[in-house]
Amino acid sequence: MKKSTIPTLSALTLAMSLAFGGSVIAQEQVTDNQFWWPEQLNLSPLRQNAVESNPYGSDYHYAEAFKSLDLDAVKKDIKALMTESQDWWPADYGHYGPFFIRMAWHSAGVYRIFDGRGGAAGGQQRFEPLNSWPDNVNLDKARRLLWPIKQKYGSKISWGDLMVLTGNVALESMGFKTFGFAGGRVDDWEAEQVNWGSEKAWLDSKRRNEKGELAKPMGATQMGLIYVNPEGPNGVPDPLASAKEIRDTFGRMAMNDEETVALIAGGHTFGKAHGAHDPSKCVGADPAASGVEAQGLGWKNKCGKGHSEDTVTSGLEGAWSSNPTKWTMEYLTWLYTFDWVQTKSPAGHIQWTPADDKAANLVPDAHLPDKRHAPMMFTSDIALKEDPIYREITTRFLKNPQEFELAFAKAWFKLTHRDMGPKARYLGADVPAEMLIWQDPIPALDHPVIDNADIKALGNKILASGLTVPELVRTAWASASSFRGTDMRGGANGARIRLEPMMNWQANNPKELAKVLAKLEKVQKDFNGSLKGGKKVSLADVIVLGGSVAVEKAAKEAGVTVSVPFTPGRMDATQAQTDVSSFAVLEPTADGFRNYYSKDSSHSPAEMLIERANMLNLTVPEMTVLVGGLRALGANSAGVKHGVFTDKPGTLSNDFFVNLLDMSTKWSKSEKQEGIYEGQDRKSGKLKWTATPVDLVFGSHSELRAVSEVYGAQDGQDRFVQDFIKAWNKVMNADRFDI
């Protein structure tokens, strides 16, 4: 039989139609496991940003690449870009500075204190959902304007660093002196899994409790906003109600009232809002919803030119000052000079205009030389005048311009660097010398560290102190596991576990902690007294070493001789270097590694375990082996016995996995304790073990069970010990940015 042929062009057309045009194969929606079993524990957060996803490869080290960068040359190129207006997206007032300030602000401004997520690190503004949020309309163009510079310097500067640096250069190019800049933001290669809210529609708001308070960890009032609705809460133009929301949302970004005022007043000194037309009639789909031909650009405007004087962004329209590309005091001056009355933008959005007709021509048009306008304010601007606390600050800044300028410079620096962690991570020649309390300062190493012989001797002293293996392990874990990789805060360095507020956290069992720390401090003091040559050891090092030698002892008890790596060089922070309120948000409401769970937790015990493991940058196998090992070591908070599936606690055995997988045990919910399970012998009915959901999930969840079987096998003990030590060492050194 003669076979029919399809012309090449037709075949290509057919292939493209199959790929994009609605074929059954392409369009069929796959029903995933989460649909069938919505309560199934999701392990995907522990598989984010795997090294295999990084096109630069595992040998690429961003810090080294950045150090080879000619930062001055980059800044020179960025400065030149400010006034190189492009026909496809012309600059307002011939200067892109305000546009780039908004880009940098919105990149960093999604940071939130409760879980440390968001912020400029990772360059997440490039990815969904942030690249398509309503509050980020047209910032896709800002990043495209920057592409030639990113293209030129390639791997030497990340998108995260470039966006923040561009914001800094924008300010400087308009006459403002910034506080400094630090590089070091490593780019991500996929969208971070973040709970931005449960709403199903943009600008919806279903994130408040019965008291009207925003749920944690949310940082914004509505889905798709960075902070607040500039028109007022849910679009209601009430300045005092707006002030309340501003205070809450900026506080959730770690800003106090003065920093909040400085940021708003300083930022709104520059640029303008864009609302030339009704967005519903003019603006197309966001980038994520646009076709492939749009090449990642969205919000195509079909009205007028589609840009310039026809630009539509927020729907609000106008500028705050007469010279929007220069640093002036006009924002604050005009806020108090004029009485402001409500009006509407051409797009129909509520804003404010001076009651005085003499203000009608104070502001030049951004594109039309023969056209002028009155200044405008948002409801969120009027809030700075109406709220008594904000009013005191704004009037003080108005009378003291230099104070205002410094406050804005410092607040901008904090905004753009808050998620970077300690100053030890900062890179570049523009890092400011001043140490700031929000950087969680730790004294610089100022003495020779102990050598291997000293470490061995100190370890023996710790073991001879009378402290048990579980006590030493619990203390070291409590100290180191306070780290969260989302914003690089916490950790063992600094020994803040002995300070407020960490010393009184319920998960840390304050009474036992005080006893252990007292003995370790005595060991430290006595040992330092015996050292020569100026050598010293910090309490932070002693705490970690105590846990490490306890693990070695426990492994030996299990018949495995090991050496747990230990690198000295940690220092001890002081209470004066520790902002109690700032550190309070790090307190764990749950820690599945210690089988600790409080009713203040936002999710189930197993889900909170995944959250804690994610904070510690752990993989699924690392999380699994740590839970099993810590149970065997008896490291549960307050010494509770749930999940300690061994008759020899304090020994680093794989008993947790062996006994969890033992089919001679039948599990059932306890009738006496809510949230507890009882494991009984199938034949005798005798109670063998008690457990929490965190313990049992390693046998019930198919993927976790698969890993547990590796460690519960007859040949699993040695692998278990070695893997536990690697994972333990990873946590102990999570905040060692100096090694």
Curated annotation (Swiss-Prot):
Cofactor: heme b
Example of a GO biological process term: hydrogen peroxide catabolic process
Post-translational modification summary for this protein: Formation of the three residue Trp-Tyr-Met cross-link is important for the catalase, but not the peroxidase activity of the enzyme.
Active site: 106
Molecular function GO terms recorded: catalase activity; heme binding; metal ion binding
Location in chain, cross-link Tryptophyl-tyrosyl-methioninium (Trp-Tyr) (with M-253): 105-227
Entry protein name: Catalase-peroxidase 2
Gene designation: katG2
